[in-house]
């Protein structure tokens, strides 16, 4: 069985030609596939019946995701779904909606997709990391998460504007499937999302960052740093591997030089762990002057023992970075009360 959401447009075109049909038949499949959301090949009536039958006989399917559970935040801006994928596995995906800023802009509908079920990185403050690793997701299963939310938004006259690979799992540990999904979702004959509207987050797998830099894509990169030195980082990310903090920062700089895209360093701020003024100054010395940006994330509640810093400590940490010449922001919180925020995803049904 082959899921049509796995195929790049050029692969779809080759398929129909090899089956003896004109190349335009590929677009007759691709257009409804990404904009009409069919559940079966027979839901595409503009295709000849014979072609639909041949697709079915050859084992081609449309693997849409099935919603198992939905939780919506009190303000209605965040929706978390537990989805059953076409292979029977389950994964969490989140939609975050943002109003236009006071200085302009447009409403944003950002989907946070998962690339794995569980995660092997073992970050001690992350609910997904505490699940352990189960399996990698195929490209079609990553794409189907986006398609499911795209269909929900379309019913409200809205559309997907942004995509972040910040859900369950480490994208760089599933590189080939992740990048195939990116290419499908950004292809002008596929889902058609602009490359600059996508951000991939990584714990700092430098080999993956180097490969991504060579893809000639204009996508954003976010690196989860969480500590300015190797000793502290090893405690927070026990499976960080051979990549030192210095290696990770260098890979971010190299990515910026290669792509021209600013790199964001994610920093989960934890009371009494990595939020002291001394650590803020240490972080500033590492990052100042390299064009990077720090996204400060006051830790979200999980089953662990880590506590969220006081607003005073968060502000002080931010001010130290700013006064040292490091661009930074404190992340706008979305979905914390429904366990849909950073570091909270797992496949339990709660609420």
Curated annotation (Swiss-Prot):
Reaction proceeds by a ping-pong mechanism involving intermediate methylation of a conserved cysteine residue. CDD domains: Radical_SAM. This is Ribosomal RNA large subunit methyltransferase N. Specifically methylates position 2 of adenine 2503 in 23S rRNA. Binds 1 [4Fe-4S] cluster. The cluster is coordinated with 3 cysteines and an exchangeable S-adenosyl-L-methionine. It is found in: Cytoplasm. InterPro entries: Aldolase_TIM (IPR013785), Methyltransferase_A (IPR040072), RNA_MTrfase_RlmN (IPR027492), rRNA_lsu_MTrfase_RlmN/Cfr (IPR004383), rSAM (IPR007197). Pfam families: Radical_SAM. [4Fe-4S] cluster binds at residues 119, 123, 126. GO terms for biological process: rRNA base methylation; tRNA methylation. GO terms for molecular function: 4 iron, 4 sulfur cluster binding; metal ion binding; rRNA (adenine(2503)-C2-)-methyltransferase activity; rRNA binding. It comes from Nitrosopumilus maritimus (strain SCM1). The keyword ATP-binding does not apply. GO terms for cellular component: cytoplasm. S-adenosyl-L-methionine binds at residues 169-170, 201, 224-226, 300. It catalyses: adenosine(2503) in 23S rRNA + 2 reduced [2Fe-2S]-[ferredoxin] + 2 S-adenosyl-L-methionine = 2-methyladenosine(2503) in 23S rRNA + 5'-deoxyadenosine + L-methionine + 2 oxidized [2Fe-2S]-[ferredoxin] + S-adenosyl-L-homocysteine. Its cofactor is [4Fe-4S] cluster.
